[in-house]
Amino acid sequence: MRIGHGFDVHAFGGEGPIIIGGVRIPYEKGLLAHSDGDVALHALTDALLGAAALGDIGKLFPDTDPAFKGADSRELLREAWRRIQAKGYTLGNVDVTIIAQAPKMLPHIPQMRVFIAEDLGCHMDDVNVKATTTEKLGFTGRGEGIACEAVALLRKAEK
């Protein structure tokens, strides 16, 4: 078994909505990013790539490449997952923690889990998403941005 950890953060800027876990969430602010700014899927993609020793999202989909301008993070996740599967791995489980003072994530978490399970071709029981605040401390607590951490467990596929 192999474990990977991912982290991502984006500052608020411009107008909303925002996309988190593949879900469009109404909010007065947007997130500044080269792609769609989906911190949850970026952290998850990094965790999966790390577990497979395939680098990180910035290596695979560099923000210096215009091809990824405004990219759909679900597509990036699916492409990373194809590469991981090609290396002979299957999914154990994933756990995603969104860190944001606002907007509230709880109403959107069920759909995030559905999208992630679809993109990874796994059962929803293998996908956990949760959200927390920092009790108004730090940049997320001041409403300056959103952060996310993710962990992933991979297994070598049986032959």
From Swiss-Prot:
A divalent metal cation binds at D8, H10, H42. InterPro entries: MECDP_synthase, MECDP_synthase_CS, MECDP_synthase_sf. One of its GO terms (molecular function) is 2-C-methyl-D-erythritol 2,4-cyclodiphosphate synthase activity. The record marks H34, T133 as: Transition state stabilizer. It catalyses: 4-CDP-2-C-methyl-D-erythritol 2-phosphate = 2-C-methyl-D-erythritol 2,4-cyclic diphosphate + CMP. GO terms for biological process: isopentenyl diphosphate biosynthetic process, methylerythritol 4-phosphate pathway; terpenoid biosynthetic process. Its cofactor is a divalent metal cation. It comes from the Bacteria. 4-CDP-2-C-methyl-D-erythritol 2-phosphate binds at residues 8-10, 34-35, 56-58, 61-65, 100-106, 132-135, 139, 142. It is an enzyme of class 4 (lyase). Homotrimer. Belongs to the IspF family. This is 2-C-methyl-D-erythritol 2,4-cyclodiphosphate synthase. The gene is ispF.
